[in-house]
From Swiss-Prot:
It comes from Sulfolobus acidocaldarius (strain ATCC 33909 / DSM 639 / JCM 8929 / NBRC 15157 / NCIMB 11770). One of the primary rRNA binding proteins. Required for association of the 30S and 50S subunits to form the 70S ribosome, for tRNA binding and peptide bond formation. It has been suggested to have peptidyltransferase activity; this is somewhat controversial. Makes several contacts with the 16S rRNA in the 70S ribosome. The keyword Transcription does not apply. Residues 206-216 have a biased composition (Polar residues). This is Large ribosomal subunit protein uL2. Coiled coil: none annotated. PANTHER family: LARGE RIBOSOMAL SUBUNIT PROTEIN UL2, RIBOSOMAL PROTEIN L2. GO terms for biological process: cytoplasmic translation. One of its GO terms (cellular component) is cytosolic large ribosomal subunit. Part of the 50S ribosomal subunit. Forms a bridge to the 30S subunit in the 70S ribosome. One of its GO terms (molecular function) is structural constituent of ribosome.
């Protein structure tokens, strides 16, 4: 009897394929509050499974929350949040109050959603223009998106941008990297498996040895390879 494919095991939702969210510090979102407030950064924490560190902020009304850390902030630093907050590194301001060219991060699409854009380590967005009650922001991918003028954003660049420059050096470090995410690692090639484990497995060779294209309506145990592809291989030159 054949074995289940990796995607079939993932579809069942076993422990190896579920993100260990219980290890996270907590949701890194803006609080749903109105008006202007002052706050202080009381801690900077590593958030397992997330590229960027988070800061713990305590407001003047006693409310505490987490947001992605910005480059240059420090424990004890005071920040402002609200429509009339100053344009300073780490402050949370409505994007409609920011001039063009301002570098921002953790940008909301609609006020109250907690932050949708530019949340990964080292990412940022730039105010590129305004159109009516919408603000145009340019993401790191060069894509232009529209957000509400009442949406909030943090002034600055998300911290931790150089984490990709540190070499992993050994497979063990890569194991722990994926251990805190919803990723099964390592991923073995189908041609390297036994015939019982994969449709591409078996034989003393590293080739599929059969057409790798499969129908869109193929059963789950056979639906691997080039699924419903129009063509495979290199495109011939004219």
């Amino acid at each position: 009897m054949g074995k289940k494919l990796l995607q079939q095991r993932a579809g069942r939702g076993g422990i190896n394929f579920r993100s260990p969210s219980w290890r996270r510090v907590g949701p890194a979102r803006y609080p749903n509050i109105e008006g202007d407030h002052k706050g202080k950064i009381i801690d900077i924490l590593h958030n397992p499974g997330v590229t960027a560190p988070v800061v713990k902020v305590k407001l003047d009304n006693g409310l505490q929350f987490y947001i992605p850390a910005v480059q240059g902030v420090a424990v004890g630093q005071e920040i402002s949040i609200g429509k009339n907050a100053t344009i300073s590194n780490g402050n949370i301001v409505e994007v409609g109050q920011l001039p063009e060219g301002t570098v921002i991060c953790n940008v909301e699409k609609l006020k109250g959603d907690g932050g949708k854009f530019a949340r990964a380590a080292g990412s940022y967005a730039v105010i590129s223009g305004k159109a009516g009650n919408k603000v145009l922001i340019k993401l790191s991918s060069e894509k232009i998106v529209e957000v509400s003028q009442n949406a909030r954003a943090t002034v600055g660049i998300i911290a931790g941008g150089g984490f990709v420059e540190k070499p992993l050096l050994k497979a063990g470090n890569n194991y722990w990297k994926y251990r805190v995410r919803a990723v099964k690692w390592p991923v073995v090639r189908g041609v390297a498996m036994n015939a019982v484990s994969h449709p591409h497995g078996g034989g003393l060779h590293q080739s599929v040895s059969r057409p790798s294209t499969v129908s869109r309506n193929a059963p789950p145990g056979r639906k691997v390879g080039h699924i419903a592809s129009r063509r495979t291989g290199r495109r011939g030159g004219a």
